[in-house]
């Protein structure tokens, strides 16, 4: 008799996935400090040496706590890596896209809004290029990291789609969702290129920021 196929689990909401932090509900400030010290230590080590070369003893030593303390909060280094990845993506979303409302694109303000948002995005990626490169590499071989990256892309694109729909007439941008996807992809790929993910970039960050901002502004607000 053939066995029944297991039902697929319901899809996880991308925003819920990104915000599903593993941080415990601390009752003592000392415990909270130890937890955050482990996060910081792991971030530094993964940035410097990559995922494979780092072990839990090194993370605990760098954080100034025992290995037993590490396992009090995390099952293994993979779990702390996922938490770092999640925190980084949430921070990027909050610092760039989450606060963008239609009112910030009224008249000449849109010019500065676009440039400021690009500057913040580039700063976020370039302040720790090794870590962002690690996230990219891991997303190609780790399903959970890939899932987080897809969730970040989905949430960002959804937000941009709503924004474009609100500020740009449909006769100018007939497909807000596709346009949002292209703008998101262009901005992220440009930032990753400047971070050296595929070698030294051929142009500097200032020129790239200006060109990307002009490209986005022309796409959304063409001179008619």
Report each predicted region and the residues it spans:
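N-terminal intrinsically disordered/low-complexity leader segments
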Residues: 1-33, 171, 224
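Helix-turn-helix
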Residues: 33, 37, 45-79, 83
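Short hydrophobic clusters on alpha-helical segments that form packing/core surfaces
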Residues: 38-46, 121, 187
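Hydrophobic alpha-helical connector segments
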Residues: 83, 97-126, 183, 209
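Short, basic, alpha-helical segments at the C-terminal edge of helix-turn-helix-like DNA-binding modules
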Residues: 86-92
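Hydrophobic alpha-helical bundle segments that form small-molecule/ligand-binding pockets
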Residues: 102-107, 127, 142-143, 153-180, ...
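Short secondary-structure transition hinges
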Residues: 111-116, 127-158
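Hydrophobic/aromatic-rich alpha-helical bundle segments in the mid-to-C-terminal region
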Residues: 133, 146, 167-214
């Amino acid at each position: 008799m053939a066995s029944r196929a297991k039902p697929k689990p319901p899809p996880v909401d991308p925003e819920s996935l990104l915000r599903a932090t593993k941080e415990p509900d601390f009752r003592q400030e000392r415990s909270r400090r130890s937890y955050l010290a482990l996060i910081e230590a792991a971030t530094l080590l993964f940035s410097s040496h990559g995922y494979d070369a780092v072990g839990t003893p090194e993370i605990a030593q760098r954080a100034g706590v025992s290995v037993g303390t590490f396992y009090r909060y995390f099952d293994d280094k993979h779990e702390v890596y996922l938490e770092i990845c999640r925190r980084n993506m949430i921070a990027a979303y909050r610092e760039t896209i989450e606060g963008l409302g239609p009112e910030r694109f009224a008249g000449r303000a849109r010019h500065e809004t676009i440039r400021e948002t690009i500057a913040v995005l580039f700063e976020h990626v370039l302040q720790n290029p090794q870590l962002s490169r690690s996230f990219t590499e891991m997303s190609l071989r780790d399903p959970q990291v890939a899932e987080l990256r897809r969730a970040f892309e989905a949430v960002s694109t959804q937000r941009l789609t709503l924004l474009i729909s609100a500020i740009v007439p449909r006769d100018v941008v007939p497909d807000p969702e596709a346009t949002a996807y292209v703008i998101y992809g262009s901005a992220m790929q440009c930032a990753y290129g400047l971070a050296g993910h595929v070698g030294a970039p051929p142009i500097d960050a200032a020129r790239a920021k200006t060109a990307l901002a002009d490209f986005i502004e022309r796409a959304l607000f063409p001179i008619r």
